[in-house]
Amino acid sequence: MKNRALFLDRDGVINRDDGYVFEIEKFVFLDGIFELAGAAKALGYLSIVVTNQAGIGRGYYSEDDFFRLSDWMKGVFATEGAPIDGVYFCPTHPEHGIGRYKVESRFRKPNPGMILAAQHDFDLDLGASLLVGDKESDIQAGSTAGVGTTLLICDRDASRVATAASAVVRNPRDVIPFLTGPGPDAGSF
């Protein structure tokens, strides 16, 4: 039997998006993220991070900085009883990347490359999986890959949000009901 995954974007889903976060002391977890990851784990989902990291390509920080922060983040999740099973990232940017990072990539969202790589690595049933993002590019990547449920985190009224997502939620905690079905009143607050 294939595995199910909870795909999580990083900035804006796992942590507050303060723009190119790469320092541990500036990394602020969003309320409810550990409850979400713990609930997913209890239901047999793998938790997989899929994140564009153009700050590397722009020269704001290094891949080593990203790995250091990711290792720390994974350690915190493990301590909270909600381990992260995989982290996929794309450091390139087609317009603003520097040197080898200035390229188009099938891994950069909205392209589905990171999700498809995880599908291969973890033998995933994408149709039975969920993706949570805070940008339409996250939703597009999930939809293109065939992820069954895509959820957009947004603090605005869902009726005012134009999105292709399955539903709009306010925070990570609001995703939990979707792990077992379509969720309560999908698309509304």
From Swiss-Prot:
One MF annotation (Gene Ontology) recorded for this entry: zinc ion binding
Active-site residues from the entry: 9 (nucleophile), 11 (proton donor)
Keywords: Capsule biogenesis/degradation, Carbohydrate metabolism, Cytoplasm, Hydrolase, Magnesium, Metal-binding, Zinc
Highest taxon of source: Bacteria
A Pfam cross-reference name: Hydrolase_like
InterPro entries: HAD-like_sf (IPR036412), HAD-SF_hydro_IIIA (IPR006549), HAD_sf (IPR023214), Heptose_bisP_phosphatase (IPR004446), Histidinol-phos (IPR006543)
Record-marked site positions (Contributes to substrate recognition): 108
UniProt keyword Zinc present: yes
Class in the EC hierarchy, top level: hydrolase
Cofactor: Mg(2+); Zn(2+)
Record-listed E.C. numbers: 3.1.3.83
Record bears the keyword NADP: no
One GO term (biological process): capsule polysaccharide biosynthetic process
Gene Ontology cellular-component annotations: cytoplasm
Positions with a binding annotation for Mg(2+): 9, 11, 134-135
Site-annotated residues for Stabilizes the phosphoryl group: 51, 109
Family: Belongs to the GmhB family.
Designated name of the protein: D-glycero-alpha-D-manno-heptose-1,7-bisphosphate 7-phosphatase
